[in-house]
Amino acid sequence: ITGGGLIENIPRVIPDDLAVKIEANSWKLPPIFEWLREKGNVDSYEMYKTFNCGVGIILCVDNDNVSKTLSYLTDIGEDAWVIGQIKDDNKFNGSVDIS
């Protein structure tokens, strides 16, 4: 995840008729991002729009493959978390909701 942070990059990989719901507490925000938020007085929305907040890559995986994918990533030494879900939600089409 690069420029555009989580909010602007995730919609690029999902169809327009779907939305993404991210659980902000599903991973630990690295200390550098806590520092940036505090020292820069940056609100959460702007943090997620500007930075990856410690999420370097996102894999969109079918529910049936989540456990297998997490096991594989852990086995090869990667930190991995389920951070959200893709939803068929007309109210939030093509958007990312982080809460």
Explain the meaning of each model-derived region.
Residues I1-S99:
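Glycine-/charge-enriched secondary-structure boundary and capping motifs
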